[in-house]
Amino acid sequence: AAVPMGLSQWGYIQTVNGKEHGYVREGYEDLVKTESGGSGSGKYNANELQWTQYPDECWVAIFKDETLEEHKVIKTDKISYACGRNRSQYYQMLWKADDGYIYVLSPSYAKTMKDSRQQTTLPAGVVRINTNASWENLDFDPNYYKTLKNANGTEAAFLRSWYISGNYIMLLAYDEQGFDGTANRLVIFDTQSDGILKEVTGLPSDISGFSSTPYIDETGKAHMVVSTESG
C-alpha cells in the first residue's frame, strides 16, 4: 500500500503529460520544500513534498506474480492510506485472511497532519480485496466497508495490526486521547462484525510496552509479550 511519503526529489522533477512538476497537485505547490531542514524522522531535502497530497484515498499496488513485471494500482476513497506510523516507523495494515480476502486497514493517521490539505476527513476503517477474482477484475470489494469504533462508540485510533486467524485481526490501539495518547491497548477486529472493536481484558494495568510481533500457535491463539513498569 502507498505510504504517506509525498514526493521525493525525483518525483518532484517529473514532467507528466507535458506539465512540469506534473505530480504536484494544483494548489499544493507551496508544500514543496525550498531548502533542506528538519531532523530525525522529520528531516527533509529541498524539492521534496513531505506527506501525501491525497489524504482521503488509499492506493494499493498489486503485482501479478513474483517476476514483478506486471502490476496494477487500485484505489478507494472509503479510507485514508493504509499505514500505521510512529516517528520514522511505518507499520503494515494489509493482511490476507483465511477466507481469501486481503483486509486493508486505515488508522487515519493523516488526521494528525498540520496542513489542512494533508488531513483526512475519513474515520478509521477497513476495506478488502478479493484475491480469488481474475486479474482483470481484481479490485476493492464494493460491498465491504467497516468504520472502526471502540466499544463506547468513539472512533478508533491504532498504531499496529496483526492477523491472527479466522476472522480476527488484533490491533495495538491508543488510549482515550487517541493519537495524542499512548498505544497501550489490545483490541480485536472481527472482519464479519459491524466494526465495533472488542477489548482484550486481563492485561496488567502498568503496561509499558509490547513485543513487535505476537506468536500465533497451532490453535490460532495469539500470544503477546508485554513489559510492565513494575518489572
Which functions belong to the PLM regions below?
Residues 1-7, 52-55, 69-80, 130-150, ...:
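Beta-propeller fold detector
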Residues 23-55, 104-123, 171-182:
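Short, conserved, GDST-rich strand-edge loop motifs in beta-rich repeat architectures
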Residues 1, 37-68, 118-134, 183-194, ...:
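Beta-propeller blade signature
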